[in-house]
Amino acid sequence: MALRLNTVQPTFAPAPPKDSKTSATQAMSTNEDKLKTLIGHAKEYGFVFQSSEIYDGLSATYDYGPYGVELKNNIRRYWWEAMTKLNENLVGLDAAIFMHPSTWKASGHVDAFNDPLIDNKDSKKRYRADVLLEEHIAKYADKIEKEVEKGKKKFGDGFDEVQFRATNPNVKRAQERIDAVEGRMKAALDANDLEALRQLIIDEEIKCPISGTANWTEVRQFNLMFATELGSVSGESSTIYLRPETAQGIFVNFLNVQKSARMKIPFGIAQTGKAFRNEIVARQFVFRMREFEQMEMQFFIKPGSQQEWYEHWKAKRMAWHRALGLPADNYRFHDHIKLAHYADAACDIEFRFPMGFKELEGIHSRTDFDLGNHEKLSGKKLRYFDTETNESYVPYVVETSIGLDRMFLALLSAAFQQETLENGEVRDVLRLPAPLAPVKVAVLPLIKKDGLPEKARAIIDTLKLDHNCQYDEKDSIGKRYRRQDAIGTPYCITVDHETLTDNAVTIRERDSMAQERVKIEALPQVVNEKVDLRGLLRKL
C-alpha cells in the first residue's frame, strides 16, 4: 500500500509575530496539540501514566508503564554499552542518592544552584527568565535561517553562504540583535543582576505566550535542591539533600575507582541514576520533572588538554545520537551564554521536540572545580600521580550528561506518526529504531485453533531468551498489526495454515508494511540481524 502522511508530525510551528496575541496563542495551541496527542498515545498504549492518578495526580511526576519501562531500559543499555563496552578506559559506578551534606557545599550547589524566575501578572504563569530570552534569541536565529534558505533557492549552485551571511542586510540586522541581547543577558547573569535581566525582557518587548502581555513581576532566584532530615528524633536530625545530579557521586569516588580498577589518565567513570530538582517551572510532560534519571560520564584528564577532549566528546556524543537514524536537522549544538559555576566551556546538543529545539544533552569542561573543592573541604587528597611525567596533580574533567527521560521523549516524539493509507484508514505508528523498541517481535496465529496457537508459542520459545516477544491472538490480524504499530514493534510474525505444512511464516515490517516468507529455522538469525543492539554499536 502507498502511504500518505497526515499532518500530526513532531515539528515546531513558526514563531508568531511579536505584536500578535492571536498568532502567539494559535502557535502555542498547535504545539500543545501535538504534545497532547503524544501524551494521549503514551497513556493509551502503556508508555507513561500520570503518577498517583487516582488522587488526581501530582504535578510533574510520571510513571512509566509496561512499554515505557522497556523503551527506557533499552535506551539506558544503548548508552551504557556505548560507554563501557566500546571504551576500554571507561568503567561504571552506582553511587548512593544520599550523600554527606558537605558534598553539596563543596560542589557549589548550596550557594549557586538557582534558577531566575519571573511571573506574568495576567496569566499567573511562571517562567525562567533566561529561557524566555533564549527563546526570543531563537526567533532571530530562525529569521536568519529563513533568509539563507531563500538565498539558496534564488542563487542555486552559485550560492556562497558565508558571503551571504556577511552581507545580506536582513541577516546582519538579525545577527546584530542576537549579539546585543546575548551580550546584555550574559552580563546580567554573570553579575547576578536580576533587575537587569528583567529590564532586558521589557526592552525586548517579550510577551507571555499565554496572555500576550508584557506585565512582568520582578525576577527572583530559587534554589532547586530538595532538603530532608536524616534522623528520627526531633532536635537530633541533620539536613541532607536529595542529589540534584549524579556527578558528585563520581567525584567523591574518583580515587576509589582509579585505584581499584587500576585506571590511568585519561579515563572515565559512567553512571546512571535518579536525580531530584525542585523545579518551580515543571511542565512539558517528561521533559522537565522534579524526579528524573540522568546518564552521566565524567572523563578525567591532564590539565591543559581539556579543549581537545571537550571537542572529542562533542563529536562522540553527536555520533551516538545520529546512529539512531533520526533526521540530521533534528539536532544542533548550542553554546552556553552563561557558564555554570564549575565550567570553562559548555554546550548542549539540542533536539527538535514538539515544543521546539530544547536541551537534550550537555557537554561540559568542568576543569578541576569539583575535585579541587572536595579536596579542600574534606582535607583528603584527590590527586593523580602520573608515573610517566613523575608529577602529581588534580585532574581536569570533561562531562557528558544526558537526561534519560528527555531522550525517551525525543525518540517518542520523532517516532510518532499518524498515517493515512490508500483506503482512508489511519494508523498510529511509532517508527522507533528497531534495537530500542519495547517489543522486538510479535507472534500472531492467524486464528485461535487448528494448532496455530501452539505453533506460535513454540516460535516465541525459540526467540524469547534473546528478545522481548509478545503473543497476541485477539481480534482480526489487521487490528493486531495496528496494535503492534502503535507500540513500535518492528516485526510481526504471522503463523497460518501453510506454516503447518511448509514450516515457514510471514514476517511483516512495521514501517513499510512489506511482508516476506521465512523458514522457522531461519527466524533467530533473521530477527537478530534486524533488531540486535550490536547493529547500533557497530556504527559508533
Where are the language model's segments positioned?
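Short, positively charged and aromatic/hydrophobic N-terminal segments
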Residues: T7, T11-A24
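NTP/phosphate- and nucleic-acid-binding module
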Residues: K21-L540
